[in-house]
């Protein structure tokens, strides 16, 4: 019995090898799990559930196959695919979760999240995040014709790359105080997240216990997952 976690695949038509690796992962690994949790940035970008891109139909069908085999799939939005909505969730058989969720797995309580909310030192990004998560702004964006949304998304990706290239690596990582506060607010001693692309298992000293923060890796040249069983929590990398 095991539950799997992945994040930061950044699937796109420009990276067919990653798509192939994900489809293989679904067929060989996830289909045998108790559940699959995707902690954001499954896609490189998402401009609306009405985008007819064939890749998205392919991924939806692969995820739907999990549901058909009795494996539930849960999704937390990332900073790239925060507009993924109910229509795609139904098509793919995924259950959408809030940005922060406590799950009880085999007697172990774990808080799961994408991870960008922990990067509080990056004030510019947090300001941007608050803006684009405004429901009114999201609704206005989704009302635009698809061709305009594509242009806006391309522009924003370019701006993000330029902005990040000039930022300190420190401010793009998690803030230790935000990590501790998240542990304590949720009364847990385990955390799993992605976003930073810095796979590792960290120990965190809390007031009354030692906690563990597990960071998923991005799918660039290899896959990354966390496998939770009754006995342990493992961070695993694997070839596509």
Swiss-Prot record:
Any single GO CC term annotated in Swiss-Prot or TrEMBL for this entry: extrinsic component of plasma membrane
Keywords per UniProt: Cell inner membrane, Cell membrane, Hydrolase, Lipid A biosynthesis, Lipid biosynthesis, Lipid metabolism, Manganese, Membrane, Metal-binding
Domain of life: Bacteria
Record text on cofactor binding: Binds 2 Mn(2+) ions per subunit in a binuclear metal center.
Cofactor(s) needed: Mn(2+)
Localisation: Cell inner membrane
Pathway where it operates: Glycolipid biosynthesis; lipid IV(A) biosynthesis; lipid IV(A) from (3R)-3-hydroxytetradecanoyl-[acyl-carrier-protein] and UDP-N-acetyl-alpha-D-glucosamine: step 4/6
Catalytic reaction list: UDP-2-N,3-O-bis[(3R)-3-hydroxytetradecanoyl]-alpha-D-glucosamine + H2O = 2-N,3-O-bis[(3R)-3-hydroxytetradecanoyl]-alpha-D-glucosaminyl 1-phosphate + UMP + 2 H(+)
Xref: Gene3D superfamilies: 3.60.21.10
Entry's EC annotation: 3.6.1.54
Residues involved in Mn(2+) 1 binding: 8, 10, 41, 197
Gene Ontology biological process terms, A to Z: lipid A biosynthetic process
Cross-referenced Pfam families: Metallophos (PF00149)
Membrane topology designation: Peripheral membrane protein
Chain sites annotated for binding substrate: 79-80, 122, 160, 164, 167, 195
Statement: the UniProt record of this protein carries the keyword Methyltransferase: no
GO molecular function, one term: manganese ion binding
Annotated Mn(2+) 2 binding sites: 41, 79, 114, 195
NADP listed as a keyword: no
Family, per entry: Belongs to the LpxH family.
PANTHER family, alphabetized: UDP-2,3-DIACYLGLUCOSAMINE HYDROLASE, UDP-2,3-DIACYLGLUCOSAMINE HYDROLASE-RELATED
Function description: Hydrolyzes the pyrophosphate bond of UDP-2,3-diacylglucosamine to yield 2,3-diacylglucosamine 1-phosphate (lipid X) and UMP by catalyzing the attack of water at the alpha-P atom. Involved in the biosynthesis of lipid A, a phosphorylated glycolipid that anchors the lipopolysaccharide to the outer membrane of the cell.
Name recorded for this polypeptide: UDP-2,3-diacylglucosamine hydrolase
Gene source species: Yersinia enterocolitica serotype O:8 / biotype 1B (strain NCTC 13174 / 8081)
Lineage of producing organism: Bacteria, Pseudomonadati, Pseudomonadota, Gammaproteobacteria, Enterobacterales
Gene: lpxH
């Amino acid at each position: 019995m095991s539950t799997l976690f992945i994040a930061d695949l950044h699937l796109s038509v420009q990276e067919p090898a990653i798509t192939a690796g994900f489809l293989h992962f679904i067929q060989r690994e996830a289909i045998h799990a108790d559940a699959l949790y995707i902690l954001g940035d499954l896609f490189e970008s998402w401009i609306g559930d009405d985008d007819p891109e064939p890749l998205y139909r392919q991924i939806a069908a692969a995820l739907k196959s999990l549901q058909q085999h009795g494996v539930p799939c849960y999704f937390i939005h990332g900073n790239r695919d925060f507009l993924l909505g109910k229509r795609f969730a139904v098509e793919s058989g995924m259950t959408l979760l809030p940005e922060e969720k406590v799950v009880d797995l085999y007697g172990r309580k774990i808080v799961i999240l994408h991870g960008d909310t922990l990067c509080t030192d990056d004030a510019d990004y947090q300001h941007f995040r608050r803006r684009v998560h405004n429901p009114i702004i999201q609704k206005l964006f989704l009302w635009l014709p698809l061709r305009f949304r594509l242009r806006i998304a391309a522009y924003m990706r370019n701006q993000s790359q330029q902005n990040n290239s000039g930022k300190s690596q420190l401010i793009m990582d998690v803030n230790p105080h935000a990590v501790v506060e998240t542990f304590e607010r949720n009364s847990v001693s385990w955390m799993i997240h992605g976003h930073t692309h810095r796979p590792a298992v960290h120990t965190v000293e809390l007031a009354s216990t030692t906690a563990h923060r597990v960071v998923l890796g991005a799918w660039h040249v290899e896959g990354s997952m966390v496998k939770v069983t009754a006995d342990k929590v493992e961070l695993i990398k694997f070839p596509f």
